[in-house]
């Protein structure tokens, strides 16, 4: 099973640290964040695909000399493609059910359970959601009986459909990646998921 980790961002909020080191290689308790993410993956994920833009040479060099116990494929972006475009750029390495992570996610989610839940529901996509007190700075999700019915981007205060936000962790079938347009800068969260609600089953955990 593959996992895609989206590590193409510029890390502007962490400057000046990211002026010289790409954000995925910044240490989190003495281990680069992306390596920590890889080492925490379930054993069933044996291949990790890194969608990389900024800091490509440093990422290539790091994983050339570092054994993380899994096959690592680095897929370069000539220019940032957004979350959806980056996933599409990795499509040729996807063979089936795939876990996808935003590159700055440190999660307590039990991924084995999430994968099994996804398969038991025969879903095309399963999204991890997180409950927050103030969802207005985020995209929120409306649920009915566990199924995602609507996405709402940064709702005005008092107009929120819920207080559940996207946690940046997905289990996806190849059908979802296949409908992303090629060679476009596109957001999976804002441009793709809202369009497929009702056509391809999206659920939450």
Predicted features and spans:
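Generic beta-sheet signal
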Residues: 6, 28, 51, 75-77, ...
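Active-site phosphate/pyrophosphate- and oxyanion-stabilizing loops and adjacent acidic/basic residues
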Residues: 39, 88, 190-194
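Catalytic-core segments of class I nucleotidyltransferases/pyrophosphorylases
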Residues: 98-99, 106, 112-119, 133, ...
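Residues at the starts of beta-strands that form the adenosine-phosphate
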Residues: 2, 46-48, 71, 124, ...
């Amino acid at each position: 099973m593959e996992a895609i980790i989206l590590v193409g961002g510029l890390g502007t909020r962490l400057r000046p640290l990211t002026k010289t080191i790409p954000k995925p290689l910044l240490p989190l308790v003495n281990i680069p964040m992306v390596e920590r993410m890889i080492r925490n993956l379930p054993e069933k994920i044996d291949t990790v695909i890194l969608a990389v833009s900024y800091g490509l040479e440093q990422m290539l060099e790091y994983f050339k000399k570092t054994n993380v116990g899994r096959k690592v494929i680095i897929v370069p972006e000539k220019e940032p493609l957004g979350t959806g475009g980056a996933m599409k750029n990795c499509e040729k390495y996807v063979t089936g059910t795939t876990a996808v992570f935003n590159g700055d996610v440190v999660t307590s989610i039990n991924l084995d359970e999430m994968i099994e839940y996804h398969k038991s529901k025969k879903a095309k996509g399963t999204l991890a959601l997180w409950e927050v007190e103030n969802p207005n700075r985020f995209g929120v999700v409306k649920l009915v009986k566990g199924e995602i019915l609507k996405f709402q981007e940064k709702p005005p205060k008092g107009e929120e459909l819920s207080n559940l936000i996207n946690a940046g962790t997905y289990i996806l079938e190849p059908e979802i990646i296949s409908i992303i347009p090629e060679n476009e800068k596109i957001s999976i969260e804002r441009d793709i998921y809202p369009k497929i609600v009702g056509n391809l089953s999206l659920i939450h955990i």
